[in-house]
Amino acid sequence: GLNDFQKQKIKFTFDFFLDYNKDGSIQWEDFEEMIKRYKEVNKGSLSDADYKSMQASLEDEWRDLKGRADINKDDVVSWEEYLAMWEKTIATCKSVADLPAWCQNRIPFLFKGMDVSGDGIVDLEEFQNYCKNFQLQCADVPAVYNVITDGGKVTFDLNRYKELYYRLLTSPAADAGNTLMGQKP
């Protein structure tokens, strides 16, 4: 099973990335709210074509997540169902490629939420804005960003984000994956 620290991180992903209306469960309405927030953070820069593409992608994500986690088939994924899905998934997950399809599809979307300039790299200012816009409790943003970039040796691009997101979900101990929660390891 998962240790308490892993459960805490999985709970963060549930609360922060999925349960947008904070009612303790995930349903389609949370995905709709996510699109609204994404548009706000990106200052309405989402074209109609991008919006339609994102909506279709999120509909696919919702179907996949629901199919994996909605044990009682009530069109709602509870925290308990979500945790049970991750306990099963993490037991066999060895890389980003082993993550559920809905989760892999979400990674570029989440990265774009940080990379508001669209240049493919999240700089310190974008990371600071991300922490502020999403109310992350981050006491020292530059220090956290320094962990993300390994002291400037690594570019904070989509591949780095994938690695950190995988570690956030699967690592049994505090490591660089914590930075996506605004925390140092």
Curated annotation (Swiss-Prot):
UniProt: Ca(2+) 2 binding residues: D70, N72, D74, E81
Domain EF-hand: 5-41, 57-92, 102-137, 138-173
Gene Ontology MF annotations: calcium ion binding
Keyword Metal-binding: yes
Keyword Ribosomal protein: no
Signal peptide: none
Chain segments annotated as transmembrane: none
Binding site for Ca(2+) 1: D19, N21, D23, S25, D30
Keywords, alphabetical: Calcium, Metal-binding, Muscle protein, Repeat
PROSITE patterns: EF_HAND_1, EF_HAND_2
Coiled-coil intervals, chain numbering: none
Binding site for Ca(2+) 3: D115, S117, D119, E126
Note, other: The sarcoplasmic calcium-binding proteins are abundant in the muscle of arthropods, mollusks, annelids, and protochordates.
Function: Like parvalbumins, SCPs seem to be more abundant in fast contracting muscles, but no functional relationship can be established from this distribution.
Protein name: Sarcoplasmic calcium-binding proteins I, III, and IV
Native species: Branchiostoma lanceolatum
